[in-house]
Amino acid sequence: MIIDHLNELTLPLVLDSDCWRGHSIYPNTKMSEQRMVALLQQYGTEKMVVNSAADWGISDPLKVPKTGQAMLAAGFSEAQVEQVLFHNPVDFFAQSGQLDKALVSTPLPIDQRRQWQDNSALRGQEPVIK
């Protein structure tokens, strides 16, 4: 189970439970990147999950990567950022049996030469192929 929309007041109430700890990062309300970083510094990364939204109110779906950048700026390692922003959510959702951890952990090949109905989004740029 995940308890979402946690903050400085509610997170301590969940820490002694077996629940995952969800944090919704929003502009102006709920939780900011800086507040999330402070919680991670104080309580660690175990079972911490960060999410954002693109809903009916003021929102910013890029708050998750912005939180990752704030974590790096605060001295967290890339491995810690990856733990909070990727591995923790994958571990949580994999418990359902509907998500194959190996499948989502395998990088997909990149070939920007591919087109969709003879169209490319490259706009004259050199394609990346990995």
List each model region and its residues.
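Short acidic/histidine-rich active-site segments
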Residues: 24, 45-61, 81
